[in-house]
């Protein structure tokens, strides 16, 4: 049997022409680019190295310069002249039995002695800062070394400088994990993963506490002068505590150089209302809409304090960052936003009642 023919179907529109998909031009990579390829992270952009970091490096890691040598030489000549003149005055006063002048010479000698002692103490502090930079370079070399015998002594010296007792659980775990067949790289890596996080955790807590206090203080303070003074005090105190935590004592000269950084931080805090403009990248739209102007400025000051603490932590730390263990600004950012949100909710609850 023959099947009946199907009726004809007429289409109103024109036939669709097959379009060839358009591809981008081929892009080739050489072997060097392929080996150094790193995927971009969308969660957090890397911290921009700006003026704050440069000043921080100059403050905690002082460098020698020609002008500094000239000033030190002039001060040395002036000090020698003062001492020589003082000796001559003392001899003349003793020969002429001028007891008043002799008492003045004795008082001047005490003042000069105190000044020399302060200079020596300051020099020791600067020397400790330079030694910490050398220790960090030495640790970086040991982390790439396959030799033996230097890693254990180096780590024990770091533990002694940090004030970690031999009976500390973290140090005991490190002693139990190392043996004679391990090279310096493995010994230092174990120290960085078992002992160093104890100090890093304390530094993180100090940074979180200072950043939170700066955020909440500026969020509730109505006076800009109080905000500036509070930020200056908290930033200097944070740097001193982090340096002391890692076994570094800052002298007067280092604090004067750090004061320049604090002034920059205060200037940034005065312009922290820019946080409201870019707040959509940092927090959800709902929370940004509920934040007041003072709260946004407080978050900006808190983030800058946290950034200052991270840089101080990096420069005072005896070991370089390994395995991406460097604290990120985003971690402190989330804590600050959560604390501000909790504070705002607590402020609304009593008013609603």
UniProtKB/Swiss-Prot annotation:
Disulfide bond positions: none
Predominant cellular place of this UniProt entry's protein: membrane
Membrane topology: Multi-pass membrane protein
The keyword Transmembrane is annotated on this UniProt entry: yes
Membrane-spanning parts: 70-90, 100-120, 213-233
Keywords, ordered alphabetically: Cell inner membrane, Cell membrane, Membrane, Transmembrane, Transmembrane helix
Coiled coil feature spans: none
Family designation: Belongs to the UPF0283 family.
Listed HAMAP family: UPF0283
Record's protein name: UPF0283 membrane protein YcjF
Biological source species: Shigella sonnei (strain Ss046)
